[in-house]
Amino acid sequence: MSVAETEEGVFEATATIDNGSFGTRTIRFETGRLAQQAAGSVVGYLDDENMLLSATTASKNPKEHFNFFPLTVDVEERMYAAGRIPGSFFRREGRPSTDAILTCRLIDRPLRPSFVNGLRNEIQVVVTILSLDPNDLYDVVAINAASASTQLAGLPFSGPVGGVRVALIDGQWVAFPNVEQLERAVFDMVVAGRIVGTEEDGTPDVAIMMVEAEATDKVIELVEGGAPAPTESVVAQGLEAAKPFIAALCTAQQELADASGATVKTGAEYPVFPEYGDDVYYAVSSVATDGLAAALTIGGKAERNQRTEEIKAEVLERLADTYEGREKEIGAAFRSLTKKLVRQRIVTDHFRIDGRGVTDIRALSAEVALVPRAHGSALFERGETQILGVTTLDMVKMAQQIDSLGPETTKRYMHHYNFPPFSTGETGRVGSPKRREIGHGALAERALMPVLPSVEEFPYAIRQVSEALGSNGSTSMGSVCASTLALLNAGVPLKAPVAGIAMGLVSDDVEVDGKTERRFVTLTDILGAEDAFGDMDFKVAGTKDFVTALQLDTKLDGIPSQVLAGALAQAKDARLTILEVMAEAIDTPDEMSPYAPRVTTIKVPVDKIGEVIGPKGKVINSITEETRAQISIEDDGTVFVGATDGPSAQAAIDKINAIANPQLPTVGERFLGTVVKTTDFGAFVALLPGRDGLVHISKLGKGKRIAKVEDVVNVGDKLRVEIADIDKRGKISLVLVAEDDDSAAAAAADSPAPADAATASS
């Protein structure tokens, strides 16, 4: 690491990441040149060609009436960063891409808990992508730049926060891998954290705050080739491998802040508003503890919530006169007391809100084929969490087209997650998906990507929709389970079934033999309340053999390695239990639905693609109209033919082969053709797709002279014709065949030849 003043008022700090045989990556942070009116601004560089600007601003006046911290993170992708003009109608950037939204969430998740509790000033972090090498990803650079600009803004922020992507490539964890290197990766994870102290050996002690991880879509192929499988122990090793890189990035950010003279501003500029006063909490605790403790033993969510609300109303009524005008504080204190009681019971008694033990899973249920005309459907239930999964199959050409700065241009597998307000028994807005829904859909999508068949094995575009019909803990992991079931019901040949589970963590100081020790309790299959009141939300999805996706968010200043390893092992036990229940509902792919298209793949020579398409699409459109099949042609000559019935698909294939791999007609062959064009000198008749012949005007009158072709035939008429001649250029001359001649020829072909006269007489 190094920091320097490159010119007056412009400071630059550098972190060099050494990946051994994979080379080095250089991350630079610069401040003092761009966006100087923002409270804090940093330009982040990855090597020489990747550049983005992060600017942090804060409102001058706090929003005292807010009961939440108003932090907003926005990522602005500029197409000029990749030397492109946007493909939209107005040729300018519009709504954020999915990549941008997911990056916003990656930044928000570690930054939000780093601010002091009770801050009510509006904080906005805007990251603008200015330059991007198409072989690199910008998301982890954005995490670091956003942290650095927030640190420089002088806000009450316990940063800096460092973010790094590490990928397991050829047995080594590589930091900041490029897109080309990721093609060889088994596992890929984004890890964010901050320095919270110093280890005994003098190295920085890094607390992990956020993890977003996934197995790559080539993991099974790579593991079969000898690469290590991303098991729970391997994933834990990856988290440890990320810590030195995070420490280097945090150190560079801190050096930049120190060199530029950034200081945290006083409380007068950014006042903190405690949710409640100590006197209010003491009063609420005195009158509510016993009744609330009893209410929290009720197993059902609805009944428990109802009783809790009744107690809250009683407390408000009893304390209203004493604390007039402080009703909000009473409500906040009541919530804090609820949190304390829930956590105490878990840590001391290992007893949870609904009566389960710490490793118990709620009642599980799985069934398939619920939606009659859907190509695949399933219902997965875990306690009060209920997910309907629906699968739709279509031609590969229906894959999503992506116009963003990311390396992905098309998406064949699309996972959409919907969370309607009725799933929690509430009213609310419905319509376009919010960031949370996009994030949950992306997590479920990543969990299933490693087990999907390739396009060669299964030539379909796949849309998976997860409908959260009931929510009480981890609908995203329920979506993974429902999706696996629905995909199998649709006939998708998954390489292995995938299940997911949400884990939680509660920690507290406990007196043991006169000494205070920190106790950690890991919870399997957390409820919504346990998620809100706990210290960690930890979602793990995978097959019976390895992890396919992982998401972790923690509020603690570090989780001991043995605690994290234990949580991963506990999650695997739960995952195996869920997979057994799912296998009882369906364990192999079903027959495809009669409503799903049957897609067949054929190859045609590349030089024949133009003939198959025809001028202005004339040939391919006519095949589609005649056979009612859908046809899609790739640049390499791969043709996808889809139809809901076999004969239609086969008819289309035959017509395509007749053009691309033609059996040339011969003189004397007869056809029932269609007149496709008339001219002054004759009529053109279609014999085969892309193969026409000419009946000269002199042959149309059956021996009589005619003045005009249209007096005899018109476009669309059917004519029985015979090939009279094929010239050296392949042009075909036709003559009309009389109906009786055609019938006689057919009869002669069907009847046995007459016996020789001499033989007959004998």
Curated annotation (Swiss-Prot):
Question: What does the entry give for GO biological process?
Answer: mRNA catabolic process; RNA processing
Q: Name one Pfam family in it.
A: KH_1
Q: Name the enzyme group at the top EC level.
A: transferase
Which cellular component, as a GO term, is one annotated location? cytosol
Required cofactors, per record?
A: Mg(2+)
Q: Which UniProt key words apply to this protein?
A: Cytoplasm, Magnesium, Metal-binding, Nucleotidyltransferase, RNA-binding, Transferase
Q: Which InterPro entries would you find in this protein's record?
A: ExoRNase_PH_dom1, ExoRNase_PH_dom2_sf, GPSI/PNP, KH_dom, KH_dom_type_1, KH_dom_type_1_sf, NA-bd_OB-fold, PNPase
Q: Where in the cell is it found?
A: Cytoplasm
GO MF, one term, reads:
RNA binding
Q: Which residues form the signal peptide?
A: none
UniProt: Mg(2+) binding residues: 531, 537
Please state the Enzyme Commission number of this protein: 2.7.7.8
Looking at the keywords, is Membrane present? no
What catalytic reaction does the record list? RNA(n+1) + phosphate = RNA(n) + a ribonucleoside 5'-diphosphate
Q: Which residues form the KH domain?
A: 597-656
- Cross-referenced SUPFAM superfamilies: Eukaryotic type KH-domain (KH-domain type I) (SSF54791), Nucleic acid-binding proteins (SSF50249), Polynucleotide phosphorylase/guanosine pentaphosphate synthase (PNPase/GPSI), domain 3 (SSF46915), Ribonuclease PH domain 2-like (SSF55666), Ribosomal protein S5 domain 2-like (SSF54211)
Q: What is its main location?
A: cytoplasm
- Residues of the S1 motif domain: 668-737
**Protein family according to the UniProt entry:** Belongs to the polyribonucleotide nucleotidyltransferase family.
Quote the function comment for this protein: Involved in mRNA degradation. Catalyzes the phosphorolysis of single-stranded polyribonucleotides processively in the 3'- to 5'-direction.
The entry's protein name is Polyribonucleotide nucleotidyltransferase
Q: What is the lineage of its organism?
A: Bacteria, Bacillati, Actinomycetota, Actinomycetes, Mycobacteriales
